[in-house]
Amino acid sequence: RSAGVNLTRASLDAAVKYPWTLAEADQHPKGERSKKFCVYPDDEPVFRWLKIGAPQAAKPMECQIMDLSDDVAYSVHDVEDSIATGAFDPIVLADPKMLDHIIEQTRAWYGAKWDADKLLAAFMRLRREHLFPAHFNGSRESLAQLKNITSDLIGRFCWSVETATRDTYGPGPLTRYSSNIVIPENTNYEIVALKGIAVYFVM
């Protein structure tokens, strides 16, 4: 049968974000409302082939990077868009009651495993380090400031993960199943806090 573009085992493996079937999805809860899976019945022969010798249900380094990139892009750009369109005004984060509501919705959407106090601390860090625009009025100047903040957030998350991963595994090549990305807890919570803004103001 046709092999399509005939990708290598490593390339295919890197693209399987949720390496299990729908029937196996309950064994891999992500705390979200819908079940996540990538392996359909027609895919199973190729999936079993590409996972030969791999740890069960594990993702290779390349797939972990893709997964993190997706989380960072989604969290940062959804907040950017919500500010640009007027759906979210960061000034509301100064209201403790509003923060409580956002955190409640975040945990309802992404799961109670996300500690409320740590989510609050993440919001406070991001505000304290001026990673939300103080005033946004749609002007060219404020749009430029928003773009700069977006870039700062992406750089912040990527730098923290790269640093933590290199501190753990050293400077050599990091490929396939030789290593895992290391995401600091504070970074994880900041990403989920941004996702929570999208849940509360956009979803």
Task: Give the predicted meaning of each segment.
Residues R1-L143, I154:
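Sequence-structural signature of the catalytic-core scaffold of metal-dependent phosphohydrolases
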Residues R107, G111-M203:
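C-terminal subdomains that position terminal phosphate/3'-OH groups for nucleotidyl transfer/ligation
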